[in-house]
Amino acid sequence: SAKDIKPNAVKIGMLHSKNVIQAIIKSLDKIKTKKIVLDPVMVAKGGTKLVNNTSIIYMKNKLIKKVLLLTPNIPEAEILTKTKIFSIKDMIKAGKILISLGVKNVLIKGGHLESKQINDILLNKKTIKIFRSKKYYSKNTHGTGCSLSSAIATNLSCGKDLFKSCDLGIKYVNEAIKSNINFGEGNGPINHLNSFTINKRFKQ
């Protein structure tokens, strides 16, 4: 438990209800680490809303101010800012709105934009950084957002600064998409073990 092994960083994923958010806030107030990453999961890949409006409002008013980094994708950023995003300029505008709401740092993920490359934008009150990477087309992309926020939190826990943690996290997820493995039919997960080398004698 967190009482026994103190966390160096915390990653928070989908929060379905106001009660869950209240419990999370209470827990965060008890721990010392400020390296908290929130992935505000709100919309399924098909566009279905996963969180009710009461929870979204409570998250905006109470939780997002407590985290070091918020990592919305474009549909989530649109919900949080009540704007439409069609370009990098729109992403920056949405990021500035989130900063004005009390967010310390926001990484808006640009994978939903129609382009040959992905532009992920990291903003705070002082700086704007754009991470540009090649877009890999694959049906196996389940878990990209969750994996990215987890990778960033992991790098933060290892002592990396925020910029480096985001950079390494983005590169990790890109490689996991690029090297994906097919599991059965339909959309599968990214390859989280892409950096591992498997000894030939264990391969069938």
Kindly label every feature range from the protein language model.
Residues N53-T127:
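Conserved phosphate/ATP/ADP-binding segment of small-molecule kinases
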Residues I128-H142:
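Short pre-catalytic strand/loop immediately N-terminal to key active-site residues, enriched for Gly-Thr
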Residues H16, M42-A44, E76, H112, ...:
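Active-site-proximal loop/turn and secondary-structure-junction residues that shape catalytic pockets
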Residues K84-D90, S157-D167:
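Short, charged, surface-exposed loops that flank catalytic or proteolytic processing sites
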Residues F163-Q204:
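Charged C-terminal helix
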Residues I79, S138-L162:
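Short, small-residue alpha-helix embedded
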Residues S1-K45, K49, F196-I198:
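Conserved N-terminal subdomain of the carbohydrate kinase-like
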